[in-house]
Amino acid sequence: MISIERLSKTYPQGGLPMVALEEVSLEIPTGSVFGIVGRSGAGKSTLIRCLNLLERPTSGRIQVDGRELTTLSDRELRLQRQNIGMIFQNFHLLHSRNVWDNIAVGLEIIGMPKAQRQQRVAELLDLVGLSDKAYAFPSQLSGGQKQRVGIARALAAKPSYLLSDEATSALDPETTASILALLSDINRQLGLTIVLITHELDVVKSICDNAALLETGRVVETGAIADLLSDPLSRLGRSLLPTCGPLSVSATPRAELTFFDTLAASPVLSALAQQHAVGVTLLGGGVEFIGGQRVGRLHVDFNRPEGGLNLAEVLQFLNDRGVRAELI
């Protein structure tokens, strides 16, 4: 687990320091794909560079698996960084070396014997789908292939954590999808914890199971994707799964329904109609695949039965069956 406690980072700038991060606190669960989303200038890249002390924070604590990074000696920090791989937007490949050597260079630096190094590079090339490009040079690769080399290189020392700093922002949508699918596979196969910086909500939708929203150096909200989507006040949840748009004025009670994964709303609504004699009119909505699960959001009108409508019972009936219902 990565635990960040009251992390701040300021830069000297004339009379007043520039505040890049202010009192940031986060818990990143082991094995998760954690997205940190925000606009340009929000402090995302500064935060991720603090996680392996490429940027040293001005104050605060960073614990990785219980070890406080800011108190480590230079030697201890070098060893700790072997457990934290990192990929970047601009790949940072050595253009004078082929794919094989770009992956092997980090293993050479840490002194891995040649036979082990060769075996490890071959494993990584197979993992990222580049076995046929082992002796190609960066100039001969597409953007997606270059990023796959970057991923292989980041995984060379078998880290437990992978930091991704806008790693797909320079790629086209199709290539982005393939890189995200690869990262998702790596997360599942290796149990790797991935911390992913992005300004694109589609990236969070595609791969993340936890997320945080960063604005002007502060964490505005954070949580599991399912919890954010279930929270009617969550800005991130609303952005990931927008509402159905403006609706006409209605004289009947109206609700927003949110449901998850394999749960289908229609059988629940049918049961509601049968047990409570409530007519349900579907106004709009949709289903998307977010955070590895199907999520649906519907707007409905409840038509009053002859005997009247007990809204509290109706909402409780839906919530008891896993459909979050809120009057709108």
UniProtKB/Swiss-Prot annotation:
<dbReference type="GO" id="GO:0005524">
    <property type="term" value="F:ATP binding"/>
</dbReference>
<protein>
    <recommendedName>
        <fullName>Methionine import ATP-binding protein MetN 2</fullName>
        <ecNumber>7.4.2.11</ecNumber>
    </recommendedName>
</protein>
<keyword id="KW-1278">Translocase</keyword>
<dbReference type="InterPro" id="IPR018449">
    <property type="entry name" value="NIL_domain"/>
</dbReference>
<dbReference type="InterPro" id="IPR041701">
    <property type="entry name" value="MetN_ABC"/>
</dbReference>
<dbReference type="InterPro" id="IPR045865">
    <property type="entry name" value="ACT-like_dom_sf"/>
</dbReference>
<keyword id="KW-0029">Amino-acid transport</keyword>
<dbReference type="Pfam" id="PF00005">
    <property type="entry name" value="ABC_tran"/>
</dbReference>
<feature type="domain" description="ABC transporter">
    <location>
        <begin position="2"/>
        <end position="241"/>
    </location>
</feature>
<feature type="binding site">
    <location>
        <begin position="38"/>
        <end position="45"/>
    </location>
    <ligand>
        <name>ATP</name>
    </ligand>
</feature>
<keyword id="KW-0997">Cell inner membrane</keyword>
<keyword id="KW-0547">Nucleotide-binding</keyword>
<keyword id="KW-0472">Membrane</keyword>
<dbReference type="InterPro" id="IPR003593">
    <property type="entry name" value="AAA+_ATPase"/>
</dbReference>
<dbReference type="GO" id="GO:0016887">
    <property type="term" value="F:ATP hydrolysis activity"/>
</dbReference>
<comment type="subunit">
    <text>The complex is composed of two ATP-binding proteins (MetN), two transmembrane proteins (MetI) and a solute-binding protein (MetQ).</text>
</comment>
<keyword id="KW-1003">Cell membrane</keyword>
<dbReference type="Pfam" id="PF09383">
    <property type="entry name" value="NIL"/>
</dbReference>
<keyword id="KW-0813">Transport</keyword>
<comment type="function">
    <text>Part of the ABC transporter complex MetNIQ involved in methionine import. Responsible for energy coupling to the transport system.</text>
</comment>
<dbReference type="InterPro" id="IPR027417">
    <property type="entry name" value="P-loop_NTPase"/>
</dbReference>
<dbReference type="InterPro" id="IPR050086">
    <property type="entry name" value="MetN_ABC_transporter-like"/>
</dbReference>
<dbReference type="InterPro" id="IPR017871">
    <property type="entry name" value="ABC_transporter-like_CS"/>
</dbReference>
<dbReference type="InterPro" id="IPR003439">
    <property type="entry name" value="ABC_transporter-like_ATP-bd"/>
</dbReference>
<dbReference type="GO" id="GO:0033232">
    <property type="term" value="F:ABC-type D-methionine transporter activity"/>
</dbReference>
<comment type="similarity">
    <text>Belongs to the ABC transporter superfamily. Methionine importer (TC 3.A.1.24) family.</text>
</comment>
<dbReference type="GO" id="GO:0005886">
    <property type="term" value="C:plasma membrane"/>
</dbReference>
<keyword id="KW-0067">ATP-binding</keyword>
